[in-house]
Amino acid sequence: MLNRRETYLVVGLYVVLSAAFCWPFFAQPLASGSGDWDVHLFYYAAVLRNAAFGDLPFWNPWYCGGNVLWANPQASVVSPVYLLSLVMPIALAMKLNVLGHYVIGCLGMHLVVRRVIGVQSTAVAVYLASLFVFAGAITLHVRSGHTVFLPVFLLPWMVYCFWLATAGSTRALLCGSAILAVIVLNGGMHVLPFAVVLLGVLGLGALAAGRIKPLLLAVAMIVLGCAYAAPKIAPAVLFVRGGDINDTRPVKDPDYMSTEMLRISLFDGSQTTRVKVSPGVQLYGWHEYGNYLGWFGGVLALASAGWILAFGRDDWRAVAAAVGLVMVLAIAAGEFAAFAPASVMRQLPFFSSFRVPSRYMMLVPLVGAMTVAFAARALEAARGGSAWRRAIEVLCVVAVCEIGLVNRQHLREIFIVPADTQSRLFERTPPVIAPHPVVTPGPRVHRTFMLDSMLAGISPLNCYEPLQVKKVAVPGPVEIRGEGDVTLSASTFSPNRVAATAVVGRDPGRAVLNQNFAQGWSSSAGAVERDPSSGQPSVVLPAGYSGTIAFTFVPPGLWIGVAVSIAAIGLSIVVWRR
């Protein structure tokens, strides 16, 4: 157990290492990034813009002519970015958020290696934490702007709680479930399958060692965590599985990694400069496959797994980690055969929406580091003397520098787009729907211009979003129009609610909202239906109607999710106090 001074030193060390690794972000601290950075910053900006109107982040009228926000799996509803953006530009807030996630990942991995597994050497523990946190897979996704994968850094904390739960701590089970809920609420719906697979392979690995309790605890932690996060999960599932969605994600199969791709992924650090391997085999760019660990880390993980399975089966946790590493590698290898794990998982309802199996490579350094830690602990217990330990510690220090320097190069020259106008982030003006996004000056790099368009008050129909509702909105202001003998006046706007005063003549009329249609729209004047001519949200107004008509959006499944979450939290409080 570390004393307070040693704890401060360890935390300080990880802050320094994380800051050094993320330093390319801060070369231009206020600049935005290329690639998908713009659209993912836009998700956060849309939540803040809704808050400026006093609305919860239910609907995003600045996107594609109107799109779901709360039900969008990629949107975060809980994040430090929102508080930081109150005192600094959102681009800088996001960079500090990324840095914070790296530090949290290091500390979580350190706890697993030192307190759960029992590695004594600080140098070895720091290297194993670095092997996970500074690995190539998450770095390449951060480079691309895929902030939805940042919650991966919370997985070691969940695993830490899982190991404590297997030792008999009920409170650790509840804490692990709460961490899983935070992962989801923090925009980590894409990380939820990782969490399920991670706990699943550890549980199955324990089953291979003759213990069923860890598998049952893994299931309990997943179910309870999903119950906590049900207010986010239920609307997202209903949206993705519903009939309103226009899913533009390409389906490429079979998606698998050849032997050459696996070698390059784990042992070659030049992935961003490489062309695709074997045209027709590598279906995506290297950001979906790369995961540089270095020869030292990669070989050490595989050798440790082999040694544990052959000679170190006394500790069931070590066996679980070794079996888990083999299983994660098999899943990440993709659909290489009809019976491959990824091929089977694609047929399952939950996993079928997760279309790139190579992304499970992000779990390889986590499970691999645990496997090495179990082998290192056994080695520490088996041999005396200090000379060999000093040599290994020096090698670990060199390995930390090597993996950090090699993978940090992927983060260079990404944040080169001029800073946004922060003062416009909290403007309370209704958007105008336009055919195309606003193109702002800047470097000729891949950009989506979604954030720039929102700041300019534009909701572009030609938008960058794989999960969107079917487009029926038309260019023009976001407002209610009347069809038939209907007179409208005194229009008001907020993201979730558009209202106007309506007066209807002798014949029935119709009020139509210029937004895309989605389940969740309601009105104060009756049931909302698709307008027969435009497909937009509309309501039939009876003859002689006079009063305010308001279209309001609330994501379907929200209140069911809230009820499930309250019940789960209530049950957890009872269990916690026992």
Regions found by a protein language model. Give the residues of each.
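Membrane-interface coil-to-helix junctions
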Residues: 17-109, 130-153, 253-287, 334-342
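Membrane-embedded helix bundles of polyisoprenyl
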Residues: 14, 104-116, 121-207, 218-236, ...
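Hydrophobic alpha-helical membrane-interfacial segments at the cytosolic entry of transmembrane helices
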Residues: 6-15, 211-237, 249-252, 319-327, ...
